[in-house]
Amino acid sequence: MPRKGPVAKRDVLPDPMYNSKLVTRLINKMMVDGKKGKSQTILYNAFDIVNERTGKEPMEVFEQALKNIMPVLEVRARRVGGANYQVPVEVRPERRTTLGLRWLVNYARLRGEKTMEERLANEILDAANNAGASVKKREDTHKMAEANKAFAHYRW
């Protein structure tokens, strides 16, 4: 066991364009091989596409999309008497945001559009309208938690 104690939580700086820490976290989540500038460009272009298609402020659409993706419940494996049970637990707020951003980026990458900007913009728009693969992932997670409700008393 390490003796140094818990690692201090690093705070991210808000991005220059929207002055939002959430946007910075999304940029960092999308970043590949340390190319933050490229990630920033992709996100801002995706936000331009969102603005073009909806006529709304892209931050509002993004926040709505993220709210529709973030899970409230998830299942965690708990070993009791030689058997593994999937125990439903509430998701902490920080983890909710992290999972929401992760699912948004992962399912945007799996889409079929030509550029990442289009993929991300379409995934954000779908999620804002309660559709798309990332929202389906949240629904599946909630279904798993609901199905294993009987094991809720194993919570720790």
Swiss-Prot record:
CDD domains: uS7_Bacteria
Recorded superkingdom: Bacteria
InterPro entries recorded: Ribosomal_uS7 (IPR000235), Ribosomal_uS7_bac/org-type (IPR005717), Ribosomal_uS7_CS (IPR020606), Ribosomal_uS7_dom (IPR023798), Ribosomal_uS7_dom_sf (IPR036823)
Pfam families recorded: Ribosomal_S7
One Gene Ontology cellular component annotation held by this UniProt entry: ribosome
Record note on quaternary structure: Part of the 30S ribosomal subunit. Contacts proteins S9 and S11.
Stated name of the protein: Small ribosomal subunit protein uS7
High-level lineage: Bacteria, Bacillati, Bacillota, Bacilli, Bacillales
Record gene name: rpsG
